[in-house]
Amino acid sequence: MSSYLFTSESVSEGHPDKIADQISDAVLDEILKQDPKARVACETYVKTGMALVGGEITTSAWVDIENLTRKVICDIGYEHSEMGFDGHSCAVLNAIGKQSADINQGVDRENPLDQGAGDQGIMFGYATNETDVLMPAAITYAHRLMEKQAEVRKSGKLAWLRPDAKSQVTLKYEDNKIVGVDAVVLSTQHSEEVSQKDLHEGVMEEIIKPVLPSEWLSKETKFFINPTGRFVIGGPMGDCGLTGRKIIVDTYGGAARHGGGAFSGKDPSKVDRSAAYAARYVAKNIVAAGLADRCEIQLSYAIGVADPTSIMVETFGTGKVANELLVSLVREFFDLRPYGLIKMLDLIQPIYRETAAYGHFGREQFPWEKVDRAEDLRVAAGLK
């Protein structure tokens, strides 16, 4: 019998890097509302008392960058100097320029179906049947812990919580099946006055226990709640934040490979983002069809070229049909050209700010989480 541990982490919407991601995606959403053909690459930097928004944007839209940035920061919960960061009073600097014409000529075409990829690169998508959302369990529960932290903070149930937090979940596997939780780490920013006893009790009873399956917890499970003891200084006052610094949190928590490209602040013509979403869509439909228990897709592109330069399917020995057949089915049922996948997943809509915290995958409200091709794949593979 083989046994092993696997760990994934998540961070809250108030983590400095996630503040930056949410600002970048809020800018993208506001532009897409006005100009569906916009080209957006928006980067944000946050530090004590300031937010810098920059990047390359080509659009006919007008967005009030300063007020939008302040609103995002306040919505997260940084709206008073006691938090160490205040959306009402921080400086907001705008350093946005235009996209290079050299890139534009490779992307835009008279026939939209010939639209080239905005850059070269590799992208991965993954799915596994170990959770109901066909995502790895460790990252799924790490995200849910962070969502719960925000819920009880914003509702006032634990009024001493502050926006910055991190979680980490270590699961025990035997013969590739989860048998329990080995360890949970949860660090959360808090107000000055709360005692360590009240903090530990509140986090355990209101965040950890309601989220993790009780049958996975035992007297051997280790809990590390604010293990340094004090976490008053947090958010951008504690660390600077940058767009695109949490790419493993954003995806599969290390359970699958990553092509290296970040998502937030990029419009769907950037295959770093849109092709990674399409790869997840393909992998999830293959698993939902029962063609594999685990599936990883790799796509690659060349700048200015429409068709992917490669498609790879890996099922880790769990496939019900040959990987070569799966590759041919992917080519048959999924249009993975940049314009094709944008149409397939309806990506020209203002949905991106919501992706920028708690993971881009495993959340049913996003179009790349549909399993509408599963039945067709199953029939075509000869399993029905």
UniProtKB/Swiss-Prot annotation:
L-methionine binds at E56, Q99, D239, K270. Pathway: Amino-acid biosynthesis; S-adenosyl-L-methionine biosynthesis; S-adenosyl-L-methionine from L-methionine: step 1/1. Its EC number is 2.5.1.6. It is found in: Cytoplasm. One of its GO terms (biological process) is S-adenosylmethionine biosynthetic process. Keywords: ATP-binding, Cytoplasm, Magnesium, Metal-binding, Nucleotide-binding, One-carbon metabolism, Potassium, Transferase. Binds 2 divalent ions per subunit. Binds 1 potassium ion per subunit. Mg(2+) binds at D17. It catalyses: L-methionine + ATP + H2O = S-adenosyl-L-methionine + phosphate + diphosphate. Belongs to the AdoMet synthase family. This is S-adenosylmethionine synthase. It comes from Haemophilus influenzae (strain PittGG). The gene is metK.
